[in-house]
Amino acid sequence: AVGGAVEALARAIAAEIAPKRVNVVSPGIIDTPMVALSGEDRAKHYQNVTKTHLVDRAGHPAEVAQAIIFAIENDFITGTTIDIDGGWLVAQ
C-alpha cells in the first residue's frame, strides 16, 4: 500500500512541476550489508530469494545505481516507477 502511495504521489508531483522530472526507483532484494543483518542465515536467505526472483539471485547495488543514472540522464522519463527487482514483480 505504501509503495502504491509513493508511486501515485510521484505521478501527481511530476504532473504539477513539469517540465521538472520526478521518478520512483523500486528495488527488490539487493545484496547489501543490511541483508546480512536480517537475522537469517545468509545462505538460507539467498536460497529463498532465488525462489522468488526470475534471475535466480539478489541484485547488486551497482545495478540499482545504473538504473538511477539511466533515469537521470534520460530527459524524457518522468512520472514513472522503475522496478529493479530481478523479475520479482512479474513472478508474483
Model-identified regions with their sequence ranges:
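Short, small/polar-rich loop/turn modules that mediate ligand/substrate recognition or access, typified
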Residues: 18-21, 78-79
